[in-house]
Each structure stands twice: as structure tokens, then as C-alpha cells.
Regions:
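Rossmann-fold dehydrogenase core element
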Residues: 111-129, 149-151
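Hydrophobic residues in well-ordered beta-strands that form the structural core
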Residues: 15, 59, 98, 123-125, ...
Length: 362
């Protein structure tokens, strides 16, 4: 089995705590061949930790991209740099993984779609929620009709970003506290949840959202609440509250109501999916939490070796990112915003505004 020699751009928290632990499990498939970080000493410290010679450490990723012995690249940089770094990697002819979101705004996200069309490279967007076991099992339960036809869902995400700002956490990073991109934490974190519901229910027809504004830099709204209509007729309500604490137990979590029963996921790390059927019978379905990183890196390896396709392509991720920005647009305009469908003709400002090609429809 040929190992993929991986070059890493960005050796911060996402690399150290998410990608590298998964790569250790895949040591028979991957070899870390080079590390790049703008603070070179941080990359050198990590190289020492894993026994990588410091000659393979860089503070300039362009130098690393010149190497012919690098098979693929893992891009883990701040959100505002994702597109620029990815473009340079694509131009080098190397296949790569890019952490989500693919870009800091919808314009750069559209440009990202062109990278795999212009360059003969394979690109994965590392949206781990699409690879997490709980979301795939829930999707399977629904496709099997275990709770009948889905009528609606409720999904709550309540966290305390301010509580973690002074700690050694993602919230403690300067660029997340004072983001140089629209949406702040909503783009960074709520994107995961929206990717999950799109993975489970499919393409979104339209959204209508409201937000409670705040002055703090990390997120433009104290909370955001969005009503969602999916193309298959499912309706649902998603709320993101990054400055709160959910004191009552069990939490609202993720609840899906069908004609024959209900699915309840307390939180992604709970390890169990609760199913309650209308005849009174309960069922508990176990899963291993946080397997998305392992699964996505395994998928990337298999794709590079030609045994399977990449599951989360830029086209797939574009729909997730567009949903985020469409929700934010709806909050600002207080209007319904169409996501994966063009706006109905009767509401078009002019006939030429309709888009016929929607590559991100799932």
C-alpha cells in the first residue's frame, strides 16, 4: 500500500487536535513529509514532536509546493486565507484538502468552484459533519423510512464562545475573536450544523431568518433563528446561540419528527441516537463520536488511489456556504431568500436573473 506523502500548511489547533490524531490512525496510508507555518518555530516544535527533520519545515508554503516528492497538501489556515492558499496549491498541480469553509465570502466561494475545472487536481473540503457517524446513521434511518415521512425538525446549537475566549480553545484565537470576514462565528461554526442538515435532508429551497444584533466582534448576532424549507418538502427550524448556556437537561438538541416516530440526538458527542416510534417502542442506536476527521482522510486517500470518489467536493461545500450567507442575507433583509432554487419567476427583478445551472444541488 503506497503511502501519501502529505505537506501541511498551517500547524495550529485544527492540525494538532483534529487532523493529526486522525492521520496517526492512518499511518499505513499517510506520511507527514513537510510542515508549513507562518510562525516557523511552532512548526519546528511540532516537527520535533513527530520526529520530522527540521529541513522539512517552512514558513513559506510556496517553497514547499516546489517539491516533487509531496503527493498532496492539507490546508489548515485562517478562513480569510482559504481561497488564496488553495488557489496556489491547485496551480502547483497538487491535490489537496482544504478546511471548511472554502472561502470567507460568496464571491471567493464561486471562484473556488473553478479551481478543479482549471487544474487537474482532486479537491476535498474538510466538512467533517458530513462524515460523522451520527449524521450518516440518521440519514440512513430516514431513507429507510424508519420514522415514516419526515414532517419537520428542530436543531439548536447553544455554546458559550465568550466563556472560552481566554482559554486554550478555538475561541481563544485572535482571528476568530476579531474575524476579518462576514458572519464571524456563524460562518465558522454554524456552517457545520447546516452542512449536517443538508447532508440529511438534501437541497434547500429557501430560508427566512431573524437575528438579535450584538456589538461583539466574534459574531454579528447574539442569536440567529432560521426557518428552512427543503426541496423535498421537509421544513425545519435552526437556532444558533453562541453566547449562551443551556441549563435544562436534556437539551433541545436535534429532533426530527416523522409520521411514524421521532429521532432525537442530544448532542454530537453523546454516542447514542434515540428513536421513539408511535407505537411506543423505543430504540437506541450507538455510534462512535467525532469520526468525521478519520473518515474524510480515509476518503481522500481512497480518492487519490482511484478506489472511490471524493464525497465532499467544492460543489457540495458551496451549497453549505451559500446557505450560511443566504441566512445572513435574510436576517438583514427580513425577506425569504432562495438557496438551491432560483427565485420564482414572479419575484424576479428581471428575467435574466434566473440561474439554470446549480452544480451544488444535492
Amino acid at each position: 500500500m503506497k503511502k501519501i506523502r502529505l505537506g501541511v500548511i498551517g500547524t495550529g489547533l485544527a492540525w494538532e487536535r483534529l487532523h493529526y490524531p486522525a492521520l496517526k490512525e492512518l499511518a499505513d496510508r499517510y506520511e507527514v513529509a513537510a510542515l508549513v507555518n507562518r510562525t516557523r518555530s511552532d512548526a519546528e516544535a511540532f516537527a520535533d514532536k513527530i520526529g520530522l527533520d527540521r529541513k522539512n519545515v517552512y514558513d513559506n508554503y510556496e517553497e514547499m509546493l516546489k517539491r516533487n516528492d509531496i503527493d498532496a497538501v492539507d490546508v489548515l489556515v485562517p478562513i480569510d486565507q482559504n481561497y488564496k492558499v488553495s488557489e496556489d496549491v491547485a496551480k502547483s498541480g497538487k491535490s489537496f484538502i482544504c478546511e471548511k469553509p472554502m472561502a470567507p465570502d460568496i464571491g471567493q466561494a464561486r471562484e473556488f468552484l473553478e479551481l478543479s475545472r482549471k487544474h487537474i487536481v482532486k479537491i476535498m473540503i474538510a466538512e467533517n459533519y458530513r462524515y460523522n457517524e451520527e449524521n450518516n446513521k440518521i440519514k440512513q434511518l430516514i431513507s429507510e423510512g424508519r420514522i415514516g415521512s419526515v414532517v419537520y425538525f428542530i436543531k439548536n446549537n447553544i455554546t458559550c464562545f465568550p466563556c472560552e475566549m481566554a482559554e486554550d480553545t478555538y475561541a481563544g484565537t485572535e482571528w476568530r475573536q476579531h474575524p476579518d470576514f462576514p458572519g464571524g462565528a456563524f460562518l465558522d461554526a454554524a456552517l457545520h450544523d447546516l452542512a449536517a442538515v443538508r447532508h440529511i435532508f438534501g437541497a434547500v429551497e429557501c430560508v427566512q431568518a431573524f437575528g438579535k444584533p450584538q456589538k461583539e466582534d466574534f459574531n454579528p448576532y447574539l442569536s440567529v433563528s432560521a426557518n428552512m424549507l427543503f426541496k423535498n418538502g421537509v421544513i425545519g427550524q435552526y437556532t444558533y446561540f453562541p453566547s449562551g448556556k443551556e441549563q435544562q437537561k436534556p437539551p433541545v438538541g436535534f429532533r426530527i419528527f416523522g409520521t411514524k416516530g421521532e429521532i432525537y440526538l442530544e448532542e454530537k458527542s453523546s454516542g447514542v441516537i434515540n428513536v421513539a416510534y408511535n407505537d411506543g417502542a423505543p430504540e437506541k442506536i450507538g455510534y462512535t463520536p467525532e469520526r468525521g476527521y478519520y473518515n474524510e482522510l480515509l476518503n481522500f486517500y481512497n480518492a487519490l488511489n482511484g478506489s472511490e470518489d471524493i464525497s465532499v467536493t467544492p460543489e457540495m461545500e458551496f451549497g453549505d456556504v451559500k446557505t450560511v450567507f443566504d441566512i445572513l442575507d435574510s436576517v438583514k433583509s427580513r425577506k425569504i431568500v432562495y438557496v438551491d432554487d432560483p427565485q420564482p419567476v414572479e419575484y424576479q427583478p428581471h428575467a435574466g436573473a434566473t440561474e439554470n445551472s446549480r452544480p451544488y444541488i444535492q
